[in-house]
UniProtKB/Swiss-Prot annotation:
Activity regulation description: Allosterically activated by GTP.
Cofactor comment: Binds 1 Mg(2+) ion per subunit. The magnesium is bound as Mg-PRPP.
HAMAP family noted in UniProt: Upp_B
EC number: 2.4.2.9
Cofactors required: Mg(2+)
Gene Ontology annotations of biological process type: UMP salvage; uracil salvage
Xref: PANTHER family: ADENINE PHOSPHORIBOSYLTRANSFERASE (PTHR32315), URACIL PHOSPHORIBOSYLTRANSFERASE, CHLOROPLASTIC (PTHR32315:SF4)
Protein name (database record): Uracil phosphoribosyltransferase
GO MF terms held by the record: GTP binding; magnesium ion binding; uracil phosphoribosyltransferase activity
Signal peptide limits: none
InterPro entries xrefs: PRibTrfase_dom (IPR000836), PRTase-like (IPR029057), Upp_B (IPR034332), UPRTase/APRTase (IPR050054), Ura_phspho_trans (IPR005765)
Length: 210
């Protein structure tokens, strides 16, 4: 499995700012989108291109264009939406596929409740967006969903990832690539990443549970 912890100074600076518990909703949301852009830049560095000849100001010129079908971006509801605008600012022609999962309180396993995927997935790179890769259960379920629909090349983009989640995904889907701003120390007994960011969904949307 390809695992990339992006060590670019701007990425490290921004993820550091997000760890501040006193950070405003506005600033947290803006940083999530900015990091979405930077991480997507890294995740798309190996896209295939093909030559294309067009009419330049001084005559014909050959340029490079992205080959194949448009990328699909796959935000996981709801927190993944907090990174979507940043990724689309980099890839404005991307198709958007949306998935939603919730935990079954008896089995503790993620259960899909919403799925709206673009067509021709077998021809597209799929970029999954979720601020946190914690236990890996949600990501595994999302990858399962995409592969059933025909997706072959899948990458996950996360603000923060836990080693336990990475290993869980690696055991089931070693062909998937992971891009993250930080691989943190561990999960606590409630499945939260330490030191982490807290509940990224609540911090992006300005809500609190309970």
């Amino acid at each position: 499995m390809k695992i990339v912890e992006v060590r670019h100074p701007l990425v490290q600076h921004k993820i550091g700012l997000m760890r501040n518990a006193a950070l405003s909703t506005k600033d947290f949301r803006e940083l999530a989108n900015e990091l979405g852009t930077l991480l997507a830049y890294e995740a798309t560095a190996d896209l295939d291109t093909e030559p294309h000849t067009l009419a330049g100001w001084a005559g014909p010129v050959t340029v490079q264009r992205i080959a194949g079908a448009k990328i699909t971006v796959v935000p996981i509801l709801r927190a993944g939406l907090g990174m979507l605008s940043g990724v689309l600012s980099l890839i404005p022609a991307a198709r958007v596929s949306v998935v939603g999962l919730q935990r079954d309180e008896e089995t503790l396993q993620p259960v899909p409740y919403f799925e709206r995927l673009t067509g021709r997935l077998e021809e597209r790179d799929a970029l999954i967006l979720d601020p946190m890769l914690a236990t890996g259960g949600t990501l595994i379920a999302t990858i399962d969903m995409l592969k059933r629909a025909g997706a072959r090349r899948i990458k996950g983009i996360f603000l923060v990832a836990a080693p336990e989640g990475i290993e869980a995904v690696k055991a089931v889907h070693p062909d998937v690539e992971i891009y993250t701003a930080a691989i943190d120390a561990q999960l606590n007994d409630k499945g939260y990443i330490l030191p982490g960011l807290g509940d990224a969904g609540d911090r992006i949307f300005g809500t609190r549970v309970g």
